[in-house]
Amino acid sequence: MAGPAPSGRTPSHAQSSLPSLPAHLQSDTHLTAHLASRFHVGLPTARLSSQALISLNTYTTSSRGPDGDKEGSAMGEAEDLAKRAFTRLGARGENQAIVFLHSSGESGSGKTTIRSHLLSSFLSFSSTPLSSKLSYAAFVFDTLTTTKSVTTPTASKAGLFLELQYDGSSSVNPTLIGGKIIDHRLERSRIASVPTGERSFHVLYYLLAGTSAAEKEHLGFDSSIHVSTSGGKLSGASIGHKRWRYLGHPTQLKVGINDADGFQHFKTALRKLEFPRSEIAEFCQILATILHLGQLDFVSGQATTTTAEESGGYSHEGGETVTVVKNKDVLSVIAAFLGLGVEELETSFGYRTKTIRRERVTVMLDPKGARQNADGLARTLYSLLVAYIFEGINQRICAAEDSVANTVSILDFPGFSQASATGSTLDQLLSNAATESLYNFCLQSFFERKAEMLDREEVTVPATSYFDNSDATRGLLKSGNGLLSILDDQTKRGRTDSQFLESVKKRFENKNPAITVGSTGQGTTLISQGARSAFTVKHFAGEVDYPVQGLLEENGDVVSGDLMNLMRSTSSDFVRDLFGQEALQTVTHPQERTAIMQAQVSSKPMRMPSMARRKAGPSRLAFDAPEGDDQDEYDSQAGSMSKSSARRKSTMLANGMQGAAGQFLSSLDIVSKCLNSANLNPYFVFCLKPNDRRIANQFDSKCVRAQVQTFGIAEISQRLRNADFSIFLPFAEFLGLAEIGNVVVGSDKEKSEVVLDEKRWPGNEARVGSTGVFLSERCWADLAKLGERVVPVFPAEGSDEGGDNLLHARAGGYADSKVRLLGPTDQSPGGFIYGEDGKQGYSSSREFDGRSDAGASAFNSGDMFRNLDTREQMLEKGNEKKMEEVDEAPVSGSRKRWMAIVYLLTFYIPDFLIKTFGRMPRKDVRVAWREKLAINLIIWFSCAFAIFFIVAFPGLICPTQHVYSTAELSSHNGKDGHNSFVAIRGIVFNLDKFMPSHYPDIVPEKSLKKYAGTDATGLFPVQVSALCPGKDGSIDPTVLLDYSSTNVSGSATTVSTSDTNWVYHDFRYFTNDSRPDWFQEQMIMLKANYFKGWIGYTPTYMKTLGDKSQYIGSINGRVYDLTTYVAGGRRVQAPVGKSVPANVDRDFMDDLVVELFQRLPGQDLTKYWEDLQISDVMRERMQLCLDNLFFVGHVDTRNSPRCQFARYFILAISIFICLIVVFKFLAALQFSRKNLPENLDKFIICQVPAYTEDEESLRRAIDSMARMRYDDKRKLLVVICDGMIIGQGNDRPTPRIVLDILGVPESVDPEPLSFESLGEGMKQHNMGKIYSGLYEVMGHIVPFLVVVKVGKPSEVARPGNRGKRDSQMVLMRFLNRVHYNLPMSPMELEIYHQIRNIIGVNPTFYEFILQVDADTVVAPDAATRMVSTLLADTRILGVCGETALSNAKTSMVTMIQVYEYYISHNLVKAFESLFGSITCLPGCFTMYRIRSADSGKPLFVSKEIVEAYSEIRVDTLHMKNLLHLGEDRYLTTLLIKHHPKYKTKYISAAKAFTIAPESFAVFLSQRRRWINSTVHNLIELIPLNQLCGFCCFSMRFIVFVDLISTIIQPVTVA
């Protein structure tokens, strides 16, 4: 403080008050030198008298002074400031405000540290539990709003107005009764745009690091993502594993901040603030949702599957570009936590509705736009969550406004920013505007505010020059025409960035030197272009260029109505509350309050300072508030902010939504007026950084001097040397404090002058005015004997060290020790919490120790979600649709029969399984699933039947036989490349395989090869007794049976009788080497290894043999030959030396059996064999003898009639199908002759539905129809725009593109009119605008009519869009009502008026309508040829032409479609045209007959067609396939059904060119849709009796064949 100069014995650095330094030391240089001298002896602070504190960050500890205690430290000075403010609060009843100022938002000036010391000091003055809650609240604020920047780990990114509320019961020590956290404009852009080398908000890192394994599992965090909690560096594996887009570079996950502990403290703080555990868990789920939103990957895809809400030219030929989410697993996590359906959430990312020129349009977004949409949702969620938490805190800590007597306000706003780290110009502008305003308040407090009162009191003080930033402050913040007001006004008006820049230039050019706009002269360089698109503001801390690109859109800060309506369907109560809070201001439609048009996250605090809610009383004033008319305005504004949210929202509804700049300006104005109120005493804390490199204990004079100059500290110090007055006391109060009684005689002024003389206070600290005395705070304290008062300091809860425990034992914060700076130690927004030596910052360690509370312990260390729904349950709830009661419609008999078939095929799948595992809670969805399954089963059954019919059926009729005729056996003789086969007793063996294994191997293969193709039975004599049991069960071994070959023509070649090789195989009884079983063993071996088949005997050949006296016959398909037996080929022979026994029976076969073969030679004896009168034992013995001795082969039935049928039946079917194809081709040839067009005078309508096509496609389609060689006056071009939608790649809505092509200026804006649309419920009401005029192109002047479906005013998403079918119905319903003379809707009346009165043609004159898709180009003669065909045959109802590809050579996929398109038209449609029954008239290029030529009877627009085609109730799978997947084909079906006497035709002479899918995925998707539509429409056509042709070859049969071929196509292709 000013006083006598220090004596020579006192070192210069001992003087803490800068104004007390000599006058020659009051320059910037000398003051900087003085600060340096104090800094180097451990005194990093100085004072500007009693009103301001200057603090330098030492980057070491802020709690130790030169002597090792807190004396002289930043912490000690903060305590002293708090005590003085608290004392003044109690003694004078004044509101106190401490304003923090620093020259750079990224300075590392230690601001947050000083603020925490200051708050801790204030809280230590009260012993209520509320003190702890306020410390927790401050910690939560820092956790949610603080981040790490390049230069400091504790960069606050939201303005803080922290209010401590006191009652007035005690004039000495006021009681703390409440508090309030008022946050101003969080830097939302940081959520989705983390600058390089910086972090997002700390709480996101806390969540990732501090959750347990079970919690990570629930939140969808990969368990393999390892975040170390030891404070060390990340391992390479954990860094490289996964990158969180919203968390910056992976290295930022660990920068020496103990995130895991921070998360535990964050949860504990919320619990201490009385937030329920379930709500804290919901907070964490929303934070996890935000992180997952950053992980979504969007890709472009093609979609051809249409719904009721889709439309356009792509519906028949091409595809629509859509944006889809690549990683569906992440999407499902987000959907679960938000309580939404996965599909609807994914769809919402792909479009965005906004207002352009007073019209709402839906923009179809590309992947980049979808990414921005997801970023916007993340910003909205975080902003709402922060607002929700702060409002919850305030509800718990704020006292009733009428009980608050005084307040202490701590203002800490982000500092000045030279450049935007996140790329957000708006955040930078608003932050700098706030800093500019606070600095202006500082200057006003020191210079202007006191000067006005000094003049009134006739006190003269020397003037002090200073830098006044009023120009910049007024230019930025002036209400009405300040820069922020202009920005807000231009945003409301929907102006562009360039228009805003022009407005700024007009407002400030040559009027305010602080704001300039870049030169508008011509320039080509990037620098000059950038200068022209920016404005410059000369702030007190330097000039800043603000680019305007995207500034107005960012200022709008609009949350689209799409998102709001999506969130209204959430199944999560918390998310519903989040989006229902007052912080989200919604705009509803005036006529339909339930429809939310858009919303905005408020940039204005939800609460106001307590002092702003009431006028200042007449009690003890310090200095007067600024005079003017703003007091009433201030009161009015304060009153308006205290009204209910409903009133606020209705005001916003009437006046338009206020932008972020306007809201921030309003809140800043309230702050400014609170600070300028009469009963408030401000203190200022200037936070300076000693160097730019964050080096501990290093003082950079140049760096500090620049900050001293920026803040004007030298000028302020000089001002205080002249007038350091902080308090004004009226004479009576002054004399009462002086206690001089009646000792001095004179006036009050004279008495006061005597007191001042006695006190010997310096003149710059005490002066007598006309009505009172001006005093500095030091003099007032001396006068009031405040030094005798003791401010109580209460210990922190659970502390053993008294009051200091709540203060920072070390400058707890991010800016403390070298160890913290250089090593990975604990840092977090509560870095103050983790004090060294167990000391704390905001709160004591015990308070934050979850173990002190059993519940908190389980909450902190376990799974906080264990009592909540699992993620799967949340997802299931989100996917559930709200069940609505629907009217029961009568079910047709065919539907009942079909459902009976469905349940018959799917009965084995219980409904609860579909509901549980299939996640289909709705009954109609489950029924549709059953129908799909039934159709699949029918298709696969059909395919299985086709496979059976093709593969198995011939085998059933004619089983495969492995037999060889004698000719076939002879051909396998090993010659000319043939195989070598040999037969033995009717069995054929593979000789080629046998020869290598023949024993002995000395026999050459050549010798064996001569038997190839022969019957070698003669080489193998048999032992009869070993192979046949005979009649009695045994045969004498001497009985022999000779073998003799058949010499009938056609018999197999046998071994020559002169071949003696049989002796090597003779092991009969009479030989020296008797082996009875040798033959049987060899046959078993041969059959097992070399078997090929049997000798085959056809029935004819058998009969021939029988006629030749061969006793041969077949039993059960086996052929037996008893010729040798009957002829006496039985003899006996005994071994040498033995005699034949007497009475040997040589007839070992039963006589009845032999007699059977003799009686019926060459026949099938099976029936006679079964009827033979012998015993079963005898039958069994005779069967064994026949098989072993007389078997010669199998009956060969390969040429039987049955086998011939099986062979040629499939062939006949194939030939029949080929004949159909050939017939179709021949029928197609009948249409090769082109009809010659003539000059025609019929009126036609050319209709084009437009959806999201680009300008080039639309122009091609429109121009091609306008240039058709048809009388321009007799054709009407009608373009129907399906909704206000901006397609991907377009810069305007589709209707605007169409109108620009047709030359309709933007000034033409007709009123939207109502009409009936296709939709459910309220969707049936739609509105449209009608435009008409003449379109001129290449010499053609064509009348046009444009119908723009804009939707009801309450429609938000895809306004007006109802689908292509609805676009067709606009004209169909209009023409129907014209011809039937029915009442019309307002829009239809307008269409009638435009056509009848503007264009000048009676709508009934139009006879034909040509429907063309927006991506189709028609040939010049197309309309003429179609009309000629329709006139040539008045029984033709519809005619289509040939559609070719305009992108045939774009890709391989389009190339393969060229042939398909050609065949489908010139073969299929040409054939169908022969019958006059085209089953599908393509919507992309078809002309219909509106009315009959003779009677005028409506045809295309008849009541039956219009009613059936406008079906709204599409609740079955069949109807969905008809109306949603193939509306063109279904329309053709209706025409054939309701007008059976009329024909549908195809003419190849009419040409059009369309766009086909270029990717294989889209091609498959399109074909899948077409196949579904084809099958269901063919099913509709089958019952029609009118599908007849000539003779029996009917079109109905061909349709049935097409249906079958479509169903079994997978099999036929295979």
Curated annotation (Swiss-Prot):
Residues that, per the record, bind ATP: G105, E106, S107, G108, S109, G110, K111, T112
Biased composition (Acidic residues): 626-635
Transmembrane segments annotated in the record for this chain: 898-918, 937-957, 1209-1229
Residues of this chain annotated as glycosylated in UniProt: N1047, N1072, N1572
UniProt xrefs under InterPro entries: Chitin_synth, Cyt_B5-like_heme/steroid-bd, Cyt_B5-like_heme/steroid_sf, Kinesin_motor_dom_sf, Myosin_head_motor_dom-like, MYSc_Myo17, Nucleotide-diphossugar_trans, P-loop_NTPase
UniProt region (Actin-binding), positions on chain: 668-692
Observed effect of gene inactivation: Causes strong chitin defects in the cell wall which results in over-compensation by other synthases following activation of cell wall integrity. Leads to a reduction of chitin in the lateral cell wall. Reduces drastically spore production. Leads to resistance to AFP, a small, basic and cysteine-rich peptide that exerts extremely potent antifungal activity by inhibitiing cell wall chitin biosynthesis.
Domain (Cytochrome b5 heme-binding) ranges: 961-1020
Pfam families, sorted: Chitin_synth_2, Cyt-b5, Myosin_head
Purpose: Polymerizes chitin, a structural polymer of the cell wall and septum, by transferring the sugar moiety of UDP-GlcNAc to the non-reducing end of the growing chitin polymer. Acts as the major chitin synthase in Aspergillus niger involved in cell wall integrity which is principally responsible for chitin synthesis at the lateral cell wall. Plays an important role in septal growth or maintenance. Mediates colony spore formation.
Protein name per Swiss-Prot or TrEMBL: Chitin synthase csmA
Annotated source species: Aspergillus niger (strain ATCC MYA-4892 / CBS 513.88 / FGSC A1513)
